[in-house]
Amino acid sequence: MPGALPMKKISLAVLSLTTLLAACGQPQTSPQSPAASAPSVAVPRTHALDIDPAQVVTTKNGDMYVRNQLVVNLRGHSADALADQLGGRVLDQLPELDVALIELPQGKDARSVGVALMREGQVLYAAAQTVQRQIEPVRTAQDQLGAQAVNQVFDTLPQYALDSNHLHAKAAWDAGFTGKGVKVGVIDDPSDVSHPDLRPNWAGKAYDPATNTTYTTVQGWIDAIDGFDGKVDNKVDPGIEHGTAVASTIAAAKNGQGIVGVAPDSKFYTAAIFQPGFIGDYLVARSVIWTVNQGAQVINNSWGGTGYSPLLKQAFDYALERDITVVVSAGNSYREEWRNPAQLPGVIASAALDINNDKAGFSTYGRHVSVAAPGVDVMLASPLFINADGTRKTGGYTKDGGSGYQLISGTSFSGPYTSGVAAVILGAKPDLDPHQVRRLMEETADGSVGSNKAGFDRETGYGLIRMDKLADRLKGSNMPQKGGAGRVKVEIQTPGGYVPGILADVILEGDGADGAVYAVQTDSDGYANFVSIAPGTYTLRVATPDLTLTGGQSDERDTYVGKLTVTSGSVLSTVAPQRVVLVKGAVDLNPVDPYEPNDTMAEAKPISYGKMTELAYIFGKPRDVDFFSFTGKAGDNIQADVHARTAIGGSLDSFLVLRDASGKNLAYNDDANGQDSVITFKLPADGTYFLEVSSCNILCKSNGDDASKGQDDDSPFNKYVLELQLLK
């Protein structure tokens, strides 16, 4: 393809809307100075589903979860009865998924409780609520923006992403493929539906999952955004802008001003999952369900993180099984890795390219990437929050007099370009299933971009989406074959018989270098489900258990490698599961600590320099503490390390104390800075010393001196290994 045109840059941060649009011969559309807002119809916020930052735990992989909030698929059981059994209370329910959010009592860890419930088979799955994160845009210095090619201007502002060297959107539009009749759900922070480029294509509904409220007027919605801080005072949070940029990528109106979305005749819904504070997967799932139930045909997700969420998996399956296309951003991690939800089966993961059609440096890559689209310095909308009287709300991202447009970078925007193209496809071929939509983009992509000039590569998937080639296919009837479903049942052979292999990692790798890759975990029955995936033969890989949840050493896992075939048109309800039997990896809810009893200094077990203990547990009583003794000399520089949640997984938030023979607290350490507890200390005298290991819940409040002042913390996944070294 022809080389990309050079692009100089300017700073949009200092340009007023008058300056920017006057250069294009357009009148100013920015409203006048702020004034009092119109009466609010925003629903008062009760904060019932807010996440307490003190309850957010970060695992060794960087995953974040809420310690006291449990997400449960009830399998038809009563949420209230289960909450009573756990000593907690029901915060909310999702009837479409048979899911409840339960708050646990003090001292209980949701991960441990969830695994125990799954092991008992009482529920289909139970897991701690995970914390989701917006994919932060990559902001680059924007010094210069010079002359643009004529074919980069579609309304009044330059958009290289849509030109003939990139997506070539005009070729599809000229052929009549504009996304007309298709609705796209934008699950993000709240889109500004008052923006002149978004208002014409807003589908008329906006959703606040925190209050479970649907807004149907522009003023009502922007007042709701205004009220995210608890009061409607004509001020909005300056951090709210991402969803506006995302929505404009897809559906900015072709109205003679500003920019144009890649699907200019599509409509969009906005669901505001990102609001001040942490956002959990529960409200994300609620937003997915709402978007599906409104009739969206495409759902865009420019957010994500690491780890696995069975709730998000179920929510996206809810969409995919209803033939709704799900697009996700690959991520901005600068490296090869799987991210959630980009790793899930059935979704379309989009990578980002720069103006030269090279992979953007920040774009996450791997075999799960499907296609690529522009994502560096793309021209998109920024929020204005225009009241009904023409004034603007204050305090927002776009300053008073600002343009309402910005240059911005990230897979957050290659993703919605991909969503918009999906809308274009479905506007022409509404009967295609999500896999056919994905495959049509892949088959018509420009595979010359990326490291493999002949086709698929991990950096860009099948290559740059090309809407000119796509339009040629849409004119005909030759469509890709339908997707299919696969199911795997994992069992573990134990002395007492076969038990379900819960929390097993199950991966499907398509044959060949360009075979798609999908990853899920098993439920409490040992099933792993794959919905709307490519037909064909896969390499099936299974490993159990997930040590990030249960903790432990790699030799505790068992693995399997085999084959699985997926047939076009097959669905989950009728496909026969493939059985996999392992001989170890069953989750142990009643482990034996080899060092107990060692709950007092008198019962301390010996440890010496250069040694590590076996796997041990803070478990078996509400406030367990473990003592180990060693002999040292005056002047010895010692280091004691607890290898716990950060190092070996599991749930132990470790706390370590060094005591002398009298029991005096010489030093203590909680885990911090991405590592478990560690004490480095110079011994003052010859003698016997003691290391006391417990959890922060038990000992932090008293700095290690009084467990009675702490909280209960009794979990079979409170695992650790203690190491003692003599430093030189």
Swiss-Prot record:
CC per GO annotation: extracellular region
Q: Does the keyword Protease apply?
A: yes
Q: Mark which residues the record calls propeptide.
A: 23-148
- Its top-level enzyme class, in one word, is hydrolase
> An example of a Gene Ontology BP annotation on this entry?
proteolysis
Q: Which InterPro entries match?
A: Fervidolysin-like_N_prodom, Fervidolysin_dom, Ig-like_fold, Ig_Fls_DR_A0283-like, Peptidase_C_arc/bac, Peptidase_S8/S53_dom, Peptidase_S8/S53_dom_sf, Peptidase_S8_His-AS
**Which Gene Ontology MF annotations are present?**
serine-type endopeptidase activity
| Chief place where the protein resides | secreted
Query: Ranges for the Peptidase S8 domain?
Result: 159-471
> What residue stretch is flagged as signal peptide?
1-22
Q: Which PANTHER family match?
A: CEREVISIN-RELATED, PEPTIDASE S8
This chain's protein is named Probable subtilase-type serine protease DR_A0283
- Organism equals Deinococcus radiodurans (strain ATCC 13939 / DSM 20539 / JCM 16871 / CCUG 27074 / LMG 4051 / NBRC 15346 / NCIMB 9279 / VKM B-1422 / R1)
